[in-house]
């Protein structure tokens, strides 16, 4: 009797172990099949040393992962050659969609032709690509409008000015902002650009560059910066030079959360606010529409000017 029970329990244990093994295999097989059906998306920004691009990447990732897919992001750190190699690497990895934010507006034709040959959908974000024929869609802010908004505020709040420009000419979005500003002040001879310099839109570069311009042109009383990080660098230089908030009008583009405090304190005059959250989300949604066979559509989002008069409106403490 004891032997019979022992055999019976042994048989039941064997069946139980076999069932567990089958269940584990089924789960593993399901996981493998899920991984095989997940689509890869790639994103290559000009830099991630800017919270603006971190927010865009965060929004794209949220949409992609909600679809059960994968986003691979790369940071070429403002190096055009490295960006091209990062793009080639993502093409080799088999991405279906590539979001690009070019370091420069040129030199992309060869690698974008490679993306097209590999049937990769390319979507430009935050800035236009010179080789637009290789791009399925572009999602940007109205960059010329952003510069023009800053100029319009300046013209209505000052009788004249000696202006310094902080630029990033290789980035088309930045160049368009400065061009929008220049065009708007061109009809007002009391406003003159007396100094301009490149800063790649980086705070740590803008600060010493601004200090040099102030030393060479102490008459500067207006600063137009391509973005808010550059404006923050300019403000740091102005403070180091002993300027007070009322001495210099400072304009930027982006709407970084810190800009609100600087506007309240009088150090920053205004910023043309972009919405990196909408840019990222809409770029990702556009990618899925194209994958579904729908017609591609370029998107240009309006900017709005943030000043001391409206700085406390809709202040959620973060990005738009």
Regions found by a protein language model. Name each.
Residues 11-13, 19-31, 184-185, 275-320:
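Hinge/cleft segment of the Venus flytrap/periplasmic-binding protein
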Residues 40-59, 63, 67, 72-85, ...:
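Extracytoplasmic "Venus flytrap"
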Residues 52-69, 146-150, 173-191, 205, ...:
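Short, solvent-exposed amphipathic alpha-helices that sit
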Residues 83, 139-163, 175-176, 203-207, ...:
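Hydrophobic alpha-helical segments within soluble ligand-binding/sensing domains
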Residues 97-116, 181, 192-195, 200-260:
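Hydrophobic alpha-helical
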Residues 105-145, 156, 162, 256-264, ...:
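Flexible loop/hinge segments that line or gate small-molecule binding clefts
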